[in-house]
Amino acid sequence: MEWPACGMMAVSAMSLNRRNFIVGGLAVPALARKERAAPRPNLVLIVADGLGSWMLGCGGNREIRTPNIDQLAQSGARFENQFACTPASSPSLATLYTGRVPRQHGIQDFLTGEPIENPPQGQAAAPPSFRNEVLLSDILSANGYECGFVGNWSLGDDSTPQHGYHFWSACDGSLAYQNPRISSNGKAATESGYLTELLTAKAGAFLDQQTAAKPFFLTVSYPNPHPPYGGHPARYYEMYAKASFETTGWERAAANALRDKEYLADTVGNNRKAAAAVTALDDQIPLLLAKLQQRGLRENTVIVVTSDNGYLLGRHGLWSAGLASNPINMYDEVVGTPMIWHWLGHVPPQSVRPEVVSTYDFVPTVCELLDLPVPAGGNLCGRSYLPLLMGKPLPKKSPWRHTVFGQYRNTEMARDTRFKLVLRNAGAGPNELFDLGVDPREKINQYDNPKYLNDRDQMARAIEGWRRTTAG
């Protein structure tokens, strides 16, 4: 058992925040542009909201239709053991974009104007220090990328462009799927139509402005399949009108269900609606690919599909994500997220990677792919998995780690390919240990089983070490 060393790829030991990262729009010397013979590839990051890897056809789901995402995975690489650090939208996205974990970037829960005190749910605002965090968009913008953001920001002020983005179209937090209010480069207006399709059109407008002369980074953060489940086009509901969802393993509402009891009252009916939202998202993929092809940008564009967290949709008798239960849960359905990479002629097709990777590995991987330094002083605990992505062996002296970690409020997790340990309240409990080799659905808590004490204690020490290395 081991935990990752933080800052392993930093270019210096200097403290780095957004203020000393960018001065007058120019990168400071620590992250100055590097000369490069070949043009850097473009990057399109497609982020779903509440899409677990188990909800995709390529992830084994036999009832929800995702042919386009499945095809991207088939023609590229899919990490089947990718886990979000936090099963909640705002902290997970902050980790995805910064490579830092909640105790570092300060967003501990989903951001809402109405947090609940008991049990704690939601966070009123990002801490003031978050504006000084260095996001991937800051790095790429400072290194010559044209950066565009479209969709659900979830990290605070979404009215004006943030963190190095030049093009900005953000939907508000209400997630109204029909006739939504969208802020485009500082001007908010209600727009007619279906939100998901409107966001794809906004992404297309950004791509229409791009040429091969300058690389670009586009984030398309879709609200699908997050509730509310109304407002999607009728054709998607019709697809699932008779679906039984017998294979999804849903259960009646659990005694510790905290939220979403209205969805659990009609689990099959609401699974039909959730599936409709997933397929509506899936149908946006070919539209984005067609626009890239039309602009002559497809071959030099890396496409990544991921999500902030998953949803249970009735598994374990719960509906949403980490806060679906009291205490917070870290089930694979909510921490297991897609991580699909597609780059024609570069990423080997039909690649299914078994290594355990995390959301906090994304920024280091992109930086290595684009030949850019990882921010110095950021205390990043992630590691680039670019060699794995490209089907190349790692150095024998530097094998891939076996364990990833998670944190959500008072709950911490360590997971490898065999075990998952969940510690709450700094180990005071209630705690859980699952032997995933014989219990993949996480039904049998082995925490107090004498047979597993060595494994449990080894993972607990790993969490303690990770906690120390990610402090501050």
Where do the protein language model's features map onto the residues?
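N-terminal secretory signal peptides
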Residues: M1-L16
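C-terminal segment of N-terminal export signals and the immediately downstream linker at the start
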Residues: G7, V11, A32-L45
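N-terminal secretory signal peptides and thylakoid transit peptides that target proteins
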Residues: S12-L26
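Alpha-helical elements of Rossmann-like donor-binding domains used by nucleotide-donor carbohydrate transfer enzymes
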Residues: N20, G24, N68, P91, ...
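Active-site-proximal cap/lid insertion segments
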Residues: A37-P41, A48-E63, A170-V357, L369-N379, ...
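Active-site segment of extracytoplasmic enzymes that catalyze sulfate/phosphate-ester chemistry
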Residues: I46, G52-G148, F167-S174
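Polar, surface-exposed loop/tail segments
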Residues: T66, L96, N152, P161, ...
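Active-site beta-strand termini and strand-to-loop segments that position acidic
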Residues: A414-T417, R424
